[in-house]
Amino acid sequence: MAGAELIGNEEMKEVMDVLETGVFMRYGFDKERQGIFKVKQFEEEFAQYCGSTYALGVTSGSSALKVALAAMGVGPGDEVIVPAFTFVATWEAVLEVGAIPVMGDIDAT
């Protein structure tokens, strides 16, 4: 499988650390977590890498689009220009924050 060669002992250990706690949620269960906060650690390191104060790990690109729109203050009644040829998540994220997707294209033909 393509990409499998990139998974080595270090990656396996990181995953096993989480699996061994039995806690698969981002928040809560601090005692059971045994001091293992992989997502929080990633968010902090990624924010620092990007020169940002905040970063938020999410479950998918769809979630990332929705979070980005909300972070920019996009909401009900706002119009957001989206590509006419794209994956449906682009439009769904706009609709989920209550905004109106406006299809745009780069070629009049």
Describe the function of each predicted region:
Residues 70-109:
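PLP-dependent aminotransferase-like
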Residues 1-70, 75, 97:
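Conserved PLP-binding active-site segment in aminotransferase class I/II-type PLP enzymes
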